[in-house]
Amino acid sequence: MLRAAFRGSAYIGVFARATESCVLVRPDLDDDFVDSIADELGVPAVQTTVGGSSTVGSLAAGNSSGLLVSNRIRERERDRIEAAGVTVGELPGAVNAAGNVVVANDDGAYVHSGLSDDAVAAVEETLDVSATRGQLAGVDTVGTAAVATTDGVLCHPKATDAELERIEETLGVYADVGTVNYGAPLVGSGLVAADDGYLVGDDTTGPEIGRIEDTLGYIE
């Protein structure tokens, strides 16, 4: 576990996205810090923007099969990610901040209820999983409201039992609720997780960390 802030912000999930293949991070972080992030998550780090924006956590989602990004990605950004051996796909349509609207692991993808058929097809093709539309706590931006690994998914504290059951069925893992950064309900904004480790915003409390570790499988 690594408590972190990116340029003074505890909302690290906005600026980083981890899969089991790599972690994207905003490009203006110190090299030693980036090395610490890669070591904690057990995957190589790729420093990049997406569409010229440093909010790469909001604009990318993925799993071991690939990385789905906003269709505003530039060619040189795509080349940088693909150079790390990662397959890149683009999310079509107006709702294209992939990290905000997709939460995925290697068993499934749970996506914004308003995604078009073409967008859902892009999710399924890039990530090689079946996708299910839905909400969490009535929130369509499910990528901000949940964080998943291959062992669990942590969700918005007001997610309903029916929503938790639906995301469990989709991702094939245990789901529970929690918060980050001293009560923030959009857990995706302050948590970056992979199977080997995780980063949390530096305002996250001990009880919040306990729930993260229990839900995402870091405690055996």
Swiss-Prot record:
UniProt key word Transmembrane: no
Family: Belongs to the eIF-6 family.
Keywords: Initiation factor, Protein biosynthesis
Transmembrane segments: none
Role, per record: Binds to the 50S ribosomal subunit and prevents its association with the 30S ribosomal subunit to form the 70S initiation complex.
Gene Ontology biological process terms, A to Z: cytosolic ribosome assembly
Organism: Halobacterium salinarum (strain ATCC 29341 / DSM 671 / R1)
NCBIfam families per record: eIF-6, PRK04046.1-4
Annotated Pfam families: eIF-6
Protein name: Translation initiation factor 6
